[in-house]
């Protein structure tokens, strides 16, 4: 969530940030300001009424003492009893008012929370406004392959070499699914092992999280409630609980320290996870996206960092560099793109995409998005650290990046490394995982 103090201090700046993301939140921001005034007013009213009740209780305590003394002396206590009863009646009425206030306060708080959760993150000020038309390619890395023959599509190459079985994948699980077979399965596993070994060498902690999550994980990551209907759900027939199949390991890693206060000495936390990812991918695929470029299940290694706010920019640069090195290590041609505000996901303040060339698609496809959420996810998940100098808890910053997803690296590798006879040259960094094999050829 965005800090409500920022909204109250400069609502126009928040509205401008939302417009840069191509989201009209003016009415929501105005409602947040109204609700905040109402909530604070109601809390003040409740506190005043509670103070009145406490004053009556204190007064009755004195009156009971006076009544007891009067009874010992045989004096008339009717006036004291009348005042005590009046105070008790007033106290009961105050209790009713406080109960009404608390119910109304809950309704207002719930609406305020809903409004706050619906706001996207503020984009960093250096991002261009608007959508993908304003994305900025920053650099092109690696030699762009040129062919002295007519290059084939990765679907044809994979089928000819027996790497992927698309038809039987559809038979098993429907459209948008495939089976890695033989050397295809080994090549996929080699890619994942290469990614994992690189992250371990960089000192990142390896995590294998559950593949299904509670709703709160998606809420913390900022993917829910807006995108809750775009992921696969598993309903438990014995109760009302629903689990959600992992759309990305980010949703799991982000919640590992939810509702915890970390020590400053523990930061940064550098994690990575391997998981299959499950996406409903509603809507039809474009004709040029046949094959494995877009599917319902794919493998991905995800990088994640929890850090102090002042270390956030350096952490972002580190993740971008790591993603670039992974692709460069494969000898593939790619580019790094700075996304415009409107092309960043709702939870992110900034994002760089690593886009790889897939020749058959005559363009670049994202294989990694490296993003900085600033304190947006930490506020949603109440993830904090205690600063040693002050002893006070502060929200951490969270960052994530694909490191990497294979469903686009695989076809890019196959197409960029193809030879005229339809064989595939294996990148040198993968050969140790494949028994030293240098080329995948048709048997």
Task: Describe these PLM feature segments.
Residues 26, 140-443:
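TRNA-recognition modules of translation machinery and tRNA-sensing kinases, especially anticodon-binding
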Residues 1-145, 163:
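N-terminal alpha-helical targeting/anchoring segments
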């Amino acid at each position: 969530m965005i800090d409500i103090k920022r909204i109250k201090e400069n609502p126009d700046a928040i509205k401008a940030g939302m417009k840069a993301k191509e989201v009209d939140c003016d009415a929501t921001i105005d409602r947040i300001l109204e609700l905040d005034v109402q909530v604070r007013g109601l809390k003040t009213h409740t506190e005043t009424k509670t103070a009145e009740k406490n004053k009556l209780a204190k007064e009755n305590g004195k009156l009971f003492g006076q009544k007891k003394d009067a009874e010992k002396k045989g004096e008339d206590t009717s006036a004291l009893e009348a005042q005590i009863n009046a105070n008790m009646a007033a106290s009961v009425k105050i209790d009713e008012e406080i109960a009404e206030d608390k119910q109304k306060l809950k309704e207002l708080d719930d609406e305020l929370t809903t409004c706050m959760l619906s706001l996207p993150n503020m984009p960093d000020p250096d991002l261009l406004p608007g959508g993908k038309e304003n994305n900025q390619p920053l650099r092109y890395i690696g030699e762009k392959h040129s062919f002295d023959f007519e290059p084939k599509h990765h679907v044809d190459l994979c089928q000819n070499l027996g790497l992927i079985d698309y038809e039987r994948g559809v038979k098993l699980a429907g459209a948008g699914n495939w089976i890695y077979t033989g050397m295809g399965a080994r090549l996929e596993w080699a890619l994942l092992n290469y990614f994992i070994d690189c992250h371990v060498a960089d000192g990142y902690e390896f995590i294998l999280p559950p593949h299904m999550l509670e709703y709160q994980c998606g809420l913390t990551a900022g993917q829910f409630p807006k995108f809750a209907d775009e992921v696969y759900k598993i309903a438990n027939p014995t109760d009302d609980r629903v689990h959600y199949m992992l759309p990305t390991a980010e949703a799991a890693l982000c919640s590992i320290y939810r509702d915890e206060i970390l020590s400053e000495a523990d930061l940064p936390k550098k994690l990575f996870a391997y998981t299959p990812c499950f996406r409903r991918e509603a809507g039809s695929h474009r004709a040029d996206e046949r094959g494995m470029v877009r599917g319902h299940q794919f493998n991905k290694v995800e990088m994640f960092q929890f850090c102090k706010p002042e270390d956030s920019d350096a952490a972002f640069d580190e993740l971008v560099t790591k993603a670039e090195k992974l692709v460069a290590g494969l000898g593939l041609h790619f580019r790094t793109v700075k996304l415009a505000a409107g092309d960043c996901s709702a939870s992110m303040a900034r994002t760089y995409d690593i886009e790889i060339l897939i020749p058959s698609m005559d363009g670049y496809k994202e294989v990694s998005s490296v993003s900085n959420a600033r304190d947006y996810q930490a506020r949603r998940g109440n993830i904090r650290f205690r600063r040693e100098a002050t002893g006070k808890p502060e929200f951490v910053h969270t960052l994530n990046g694909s490191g990497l997803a294979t469903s686009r690296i695989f076809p890019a590798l196959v197409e960029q490394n193809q030879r005229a006879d339809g064989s595939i040259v294996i990148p040198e960094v993968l050969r140790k995982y494949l028994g030293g094999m240098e080329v995948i050829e048709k048997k």
